[in-house]
Amino acid sequence: MLLTIDVGNTHTVLGLFDGEDIVEHWRISTDSRRTADELAVLLQGLMGMHPLLGDELGDGIDGIAICATVPSVLHELREVTRRYYGDVPAVLVEPGVKTGVPILTDHPKEVGADRIINAVAAVELYGGPAIVVDFGTATTFDAVSARGEYIGGVIAPGIEISVEALGVKGAQLRKIEVARPRSVIGKNTVEAMQSGIVYGFAGQVDGVVNRMARELADDPDDVTVIATGGLAPMVLGESSVIDEHEPWLTLMGLRLVYERNVSRM
């Protein structure tokens, strides 16, 4: 089986693939202080819960693919693969890795690995032109051309960051649960804040995507818009531009990149 690991700033998502099918997944907090040994213990606990894997770390795993937006965690995971997974092929998404997607930006090495991986999956699953909206710590919008090229995108503050900022900077406001309110017009402070988050982000998505689509294609209706990320369901029902919801888009992209690189190892 293939173990895929997507390390974000807030959460780390792990997926287990049997061929092209994802058969198990986990979401844990990202902690840059964890050592390779601590990560190995954590992985062993998660892997041990799956009936098709053995008790020892690495049993049943024949490949690993990792992308990370936190360099220190990527370093420790590299140590995990070296020390605990022995001869299991491991592909870490970093400069030099073959993705199959040309990166047509001013500074390609500055583009986050997760954003490139999302583009890889979008091209494979839906073709171009496409826009991927990833609701993570930041909300990112990434554009793929009709020729399958990554051409850039937009980075905006994420939902959780915005909620925390309201609670910290607003003297009479507090941190709230991110939930859909009863109506757009809030009847109390909490509902008013929830409305601002849910409908504000839905409006942001619609506005940004519409502008990007006009730049991306002669006919904006030709652009496929894919939503992913842990908080995507909060906006899905309120946005008018999202065509597809694929919660495991990044993990699928990691599987594709692994397959394109493992033969070179």
Swiss-Prot record:
It is an enzyme of class 2 (transferase). It is found in: Cytoplasm. It holds the Pfam family Pan_kinase. Transmembrane segments: none annotated. K(+) binds at residue 134. A monovalent cation. Ammonium or potassium. Pathway: Cofactor biosynthesis; coenzyme A biosynthesis; CoA from (R)-pantothenate: step 1/5. ATP binds at residues 6-13, 137. Keywords: ATP-binding, Coenzyme A biosynthesis, Cytoplasm, Kinase, Metal-binding, Nucleotide-binding, Potassium, Transferase. Catalyzes the phosphorylation of pantothenate (Pan), the first step in CoA biosynthesis. NCBIfam families: baf, PRK13318.1-3, PRK13321.1. Belongs to the type III pantothenate kinase family. PANTHER family: TYPE III PANTOTHENATE KINASE. Homodimer. This is Type III pantothenate kinase. It comes from Streptomyces coelicolor (strain ATCC BAA-471 / A3(2) / M145).
